[in-house]
Amino acid sequence: MSNQKISVGIDDIAIHFPRLYMDMRDFAEMRKANYDKLNKGLGLKAMSIPDVHEDTATMGAMAVMRLIDRNGLDPNKIGRMYLGTESALDGAKPTATYIVDMLTQRYSERYGDDCFQNCDVVDMTFALSLIHI
């Protein structure tokens, strides 16, 4: 048995929320829903709403960009990313494909056109983004 220490855990996390919000009172009124159930029962005060240029792929790309930039990561050295969302863009192509395409455009000038070529991307079906180096 080896005495080598193995480090396991989450080193960093990034989340992107849209900047637009709707007050939960307005939401309840428009949906003819019970505000007290939403506010007191679920603890909701407001709901974020994607702007016209935002979708699950752009929000995921923003979160991953924040992780890469904040930690000074070289995309060529990222071995695996776990990307997930509860809301797919279409039924034919994983959202992770769109995210990696955007990230490649963002980092290709600095790290090369194939900077994510050796990165395995796992598309999950729940809201999560992880990077494994």
What are these regions (language model features)?
Residues M1-Y82, V100-S108:
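Conserved "HGTGT" condensation-loop signature of ketosynthase/thiolase-family condensing enzymes
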Residues D51-D55, V122-S129:
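Short beta->alpha junction loops
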Residues G79-S87, D123-T125:
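Short glycine-rich or small-residue beta-strand-to-loop segments that form or flank ligand, phosphate
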Residues G91-D101:
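Short Gly/Thr/Asp-enriched flexible loops that form oxyanion-binding sites at enzyme active sites
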Residues M102, R106-V121:
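Active-site metal-coordination/substrate-binding segment of hydrolases
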Residues I131-I133:
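Conserved small/polar residues in nucleotide/adenosyl-binding loops
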